[in-house]
């Protein structure tokens, strides 16, 4: 079987969705900038040799509609012969895009692909135009459509306290701020044009969403959002709303060698799994178990983990389920996570994978795991290996 490698990966800074730096920047422009950026950073790759572009996006309407993968590629000046398709597995869309590209290369359907994703949650709200079939209530708990309520249920099921959630939320901001100050995000962030609070055009080089002043004590003062009477999940322990994109250059190891490119990681294994929609946030556990089995390794063999922080109330049960709860400080989300950086739905899978790859290099780690929950009860996971 062919080895599939990632030779480069970048992301935009994460912009705040409400009046943020990308309020005048469209989702296609965020995407196109990264597509162009990958090619500029890797001149050994002839754009004509790109087979296809797999691009994750959840809310495929308004500026994100009508196949944003193709639209963005045309804006980026990618040759017309290169195809593009938009992928939707909700929160796992851009990781699914990576999986699709990987499988295509394995099957001999091309040698070089781009995979990534975007979500501009400021321009296209998460719930825009959603109309669930009423018949779903016969087989799925009504609250399954509320991600926050599923997190509440999961926290109760696993005995996660409000205090633990507040500390986890504060940790995310603290570690993301440290990563910013120490320059650890610099290698993965691709600078973008945006607008400051006064409307002036500026070059954006850092994430806008991180709140370095956040403390567990401060978070403890916030009221529960989804279950005001009995809940524990607050806005401060939920993933922030943000705008962003991430992109990866994926190819066969043989092609990378032919072009003289140095692979950063190879795809060791991939998996998706379903779970009860009422505890949708637990999806990373069965997905990771599948991926580990396919890679022939155990969770103890994994050196670094990126778990998408949809909610603290969701992340902590997953860490318990994966036996990582007591290894959090040494392995998990060492540069913070989505509570601090935000969760632009179609972008996040490629974003956490990009952050993971950079962490693996920084830590000289051999194996890394990126995994995330998916609305309505799914999980997705990828095991990466340094080469």
Swiss-Prot record:
CDD domains: thiolase (cd00751). It is an enzyme of class 2 (transferase). Coiled coil: none annotated. It holds the Pfam family Thiolase_N. One of its GO terms (biological process) is phenylacetate catabolic process. Pathway: Lipid metabolism; fatty acid beta-oxidation. It is found in: Cytoplasm. It comes from the Bacteria. Its EC number is 2.3.1.16. The active site is at 91 (acyl-thioester intermediate), 343 (proton acceptor), 373 (proton acceptor). SUPFAM superfamilies: Thiolase-like. InterPro entries: FadA, Thiolase, Thiolase-like, Thiolase-like_sf_Thiolase, Thiolase_acyl_enz_int_AS, Thiolase_AS, Thiolase_C, Thiolase_CS. Belongs to the thiolase-like superfamily. Thiolase family. Heterotetramer of two alpha chains (FadB) and two beta chains (FadA). This is 3-ketoacyl-CoA thiolase. It comes from Idiomarina loihiensis (strain ATCC BAA-735 / DSM 15497 / L2-TR). The gene is fadA.
